[in-house]
Regions:
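The conserved acidic donor/metal-binding loop of glycosyltransferases
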Residues: 96-100
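Glycine-rich, basic loop-to-helix element that forms the pyrophosphate-binding segment
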Residues: 70-87
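Short, well-formed alpha-helical segments that are part of the catalytic scaffolds
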Residues: 15-31
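Conserved donor NDP-sugar-binding/catalytic core segment of glycosyltransferases
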Residues: 104-142
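Cell-envelope/extracellular polymer assembly enzymes that use nucleotide-activated donors
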Residues: 5-7, 40
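Acidic donor-binding segment of Leloir-type glycosyltransferases
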Residues: 26-68
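Short aromatic/hydrophobic "clamp" motif used to bind/position activated sugar donors
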Residues: 92
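Alpha-helical elements of Rossmann-like donor-binding domains used by nucleotide-donor carbohydrate transfer enzymes
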Residues: 21, 25, 78, 82, ...
């Protein structure tokens, strides 16, 4: 694989199902108008009682890399630094919360922004689905 244009670092802790949904939304089969060689996805998971399933990890696309780490503290800072050290892309994107799904054109649009200005600071807004914020979903009956 040639050097990708973009490295997307995803940090996860104790959210195996949500992290898998995030990864599916970043997959080349879901993203539009980009090739797998255009970007890589680096998942850094801090060990918890619910780590990602081995079969799910094995099914990740070829432009995905997975790292399971043992961290003493609760801060994601060490995982973020580790992810940056692994990144091979010319540009780097960071998803600190591994429970975020992205739209099918997000990688294309991020790459387009960097093609206009390689010093761009690109931010993708987050939205909650439903009437309530995500952190209250279980108390309101969402699963």
């Amino acid at each position: 694989m040639n050097r990708p244009l973009l490295s997307v670092i995803v940090i996860a802790y104790d959210m195996s199902r949500q992290a898998l949904n995030t990864l599916k939304s970043l997959a080349p089969s879901y993203q539009q108008n980009v090739n797998a060689d255009d970007y890589e996805v680096i998942l850094v998971e801090n060990r918890s009682r619910r780590v990602m399933d081995a079969a799910a990890i094995a099914s990740l696309p070829g432009n995905f890399r997975y790292f399971l780490r043992d961290e003493a503290g609760v801060s994601p800072a060490a995982a973020i630094n580790f992810g940056f050290a692994q990144a091979q892309g010319q540009f780097i994107g960071l998803m600190i919360d591994g429970a975020r799904m992205v739209t099918p054109g997000v990688i294309e649009n991020v790459l387009m922004a960097f093609s206009l200005n390689e010093n761009a600071m690109v931010c993708v807004p987050g939205y909650n689905l439903g009437e309530h914020e995500q952190q209250f979903h279980r108390s309101k009956g969402y699963t």
